[in-house]
Amino acid sequence: MTKIMKHPIPIAIAEHALMNEQQYQQDYQLSLQDPDRFWGEKGKIVDWIKPYTKVKNTSFDPGHINIRWFEDGTLNLSANCLDRHLKERGEQTAIIWEGDDPTESKAITYRELHHDVCQFANVLKNMGIKKGDVVAIYMPMVPEAAVAMLACARIGAIHSVIFAGFSPDAVSGRIIDSNTKLVITADEGLRAGRTIPLKKNVDDALNNAAVVNVSNVIVFKRTGNIGHWQSGRDLWWHELVADASADCPVEEINAEDPLFILYTSGSTGKPKGVLHTTGGYLVYASLTFKYVFDYQPGEVYWCTADVGWVTGHSYLLYGPLSCGAITLMFEGVPNYPAVNRLSQIIDKHQVNILYTAPTAIRALMAEGDKAIEGTKRTSLRIMGSVGEPINPEAWEWYYQKIGNSKCPIVDTWWQTETGGFMITPLPGATELKAGSATLPFFGVQPALVDNLGEQLEGVCEGNLVITDSWPGQARSLFGDHDRFEQTYFSTFKGMYFSGDGARRDEDGYYWITGRVDDVLNISGHRLGTAEIESALVSHPKIAEAAVVGTPHNIKGQAIYAYVTLNHGEEPSPELYTEVRNWVRKEIGPIATPDILHWTDSLPKTRSGKIMRRILRKIASGDTNNLGDISTLADPGVVEKLLEEKQTMSIS
């Protein structure tokens, strides 16, 4: 591999940065050698009702996975994000909202947000929601989504935010698994000029007979297109808040009380409800936000992520708001109504820090200079990348074109399960390499291991594991601690396995190489191959399916599905469309297969295991070295698949 040159730290950044290289090295060493002392001090970044005396109580031992931080302390997340800022910055903007339509935008101050959250928290209480109840939030990117989340946290209810792109079946599955009591949605969402039928999707989801505990649906009026309305069950947001008091004292919450559940794709079957608790999560989200973005008071920060993903939780809302930041929430997409929309928003709101995904960057890069036409972007100071590894070409384009070659890029590696950044540059402390996530954050102990779990030293490539706990770590999977241990701690004993592969270079920098398990990364969104395969096989004409990811220059990975039809069924253009729409309905648009490869048989071992390694190589056209196929029950299948692929390419 060609050596990638380092980008030095710009002098303008170094002069005012919160952290330099020497300080980083010193603090990082302390965080490993004496985590109790380090986190005992850093835990004070948030306000505690009852201060903690215990800091770290964790175990990665087989059969005893236990993760507890600040466990005797109490606090309230909503108070940390709102109440504590009222005296100093009550009139400062908390959220800038930019609508899908460029003519729609508004600013909400900390005082106004506090008022709205208290009102809505009282609405929840009036509806019988209490501490420990689960509330599902299926909302578009409007400030009310943030209000709903903060209101849940204020009273100790657990929120389960469901991405607005998910289908009714995906919504009902999450409602059933989490035992949801109340659903909050909108009549419709708006995205790139199109409407998303959120309320209709909720209606369809609640028709599932296994949904038993949802007694009410609160509906925010976004477009005014009402559709079906179930009297008694469905209630308008604006009518409920009109009668609610704006006085709502915070609930005292233990550090280890649940804060939220967020469902993420598993490599085996149904999605996993990742459970985060309150204290450690908020400390970690706050500290990582402050140092990784080198946040300075009064700066405008824009994270383009949806609230339905963990990035929207940690780095659109909770991290920024707990630090008293100005956070921008965008309803639309970066290339609508014009391909320079992202750049226009940067100029319009004088954005100082931009945090977006490689998918968006690659889509804009494909437009060339049109993506920045008529804009200056001179307000930008720091930029970030999230969701998947960023290829060096896209990194350089982002750096030169969007950032005018002056803004450090923090390429952050982390996961839903980690709660916050794990491997990331710090703007004033880390020289950058295009495409590398660089070095671990405080308290994070990464290691690379071979397939037997032996740690590899120096320059190497292997499975990325974390050898000790950190405060933002997920505590469990909702209602299934055994699956939590099985998923993350059984592959390599005594270590958290990320499911990602990585390379370490001569400077100790980490380069994430992508998933090593059966999870796809589509436009920064994780989707389990098993989930897509289940959806395909539920189609009445399909006998078997195997899904793999193949490189895609915009989305990172495309979904390539090998499909075997039932006896007597024949492939056709109509069936091709029908099957793609079927998956779209079962899971959501994000999971729609890009390519269907009709085939009579799949490469299987004698024990019946599908050899995905071969399918991945065929899908991506990497067929020169298919490796050992002697273990296949019928090696002739491979030749047939290659011929089919050739025919598909020609057609």
Curated annotation (Swiss-Prot):
By its UniProt entry, which CDD domains does this protein fall under? ACS
Listed InterPro entries: Ac_CoA_lig, ACAS_N, AMP-bd_C, AMP-bd_C_sf, AMP-binding_CS, AMP-dep_synth/lig_dom, ANL_N_sf
GO biological process assignments:
acetyl-CoA biosynthetic process from acetate; chemotaxis
Q: Where ATP is bound, by residue?
A: 387-389, 411-416, 500, 515, 526
Question: Is the keyword tRNA-binding assigned to this protein?
Answer: no
Q: Which cofactor does it need?
A: Mg(2+)
Is Plastid among this UniProt entry's keywords?
no
For this protein, the record's PROSITE patterns field holds:
AMP_BINDING
UniProt: CoA binding residues: 191-194, 311, 335, 523, 584
Q: Which residues bind Mg(2+)?
A: 537, 539, 542
Locate the N6-acetyllysine modifications and list their residues. Answer: 609
Reaction it catalyzes: acetate + ATP + CoA = acetyl-CoA + AMP + diphosphate
PTM comment: the record says: Acetylated. Deacetylation by the SIR2-homolog deacetylase activates the enzyme.
Record-level GO cellular component terms: cytosol
* Entry EC no(s): 6.2.1.1
> This protein's superkingdom?
Bacteria
Q: List UniProt keywords, sorted A-Z.
A: Acetylation, ATP-binding, Ligase, Magnesium, Metal-binding, Nucleotide-binding
Q: What NCBIfam families does this protein map onto?
A: Ac_CoA_lig_AcsA, PRK00174.1
Write down the HAMAP family for this protein, in alphabetical order: Ac_CoA_synth
In the record, the note on similarity to other proteins reads: Belongs to the ATP-dependent AMP-binding enzyme family.
Protein name in UniProt: Acetyl-coenzyme A synthetase
Q: Which organism is it from?
A: Photorhabdus laumondii subsp. laumondii (strain DSM 15139 / CIP 105565 / TT01) (Photorhabdus luminescens subsp. laumondii)
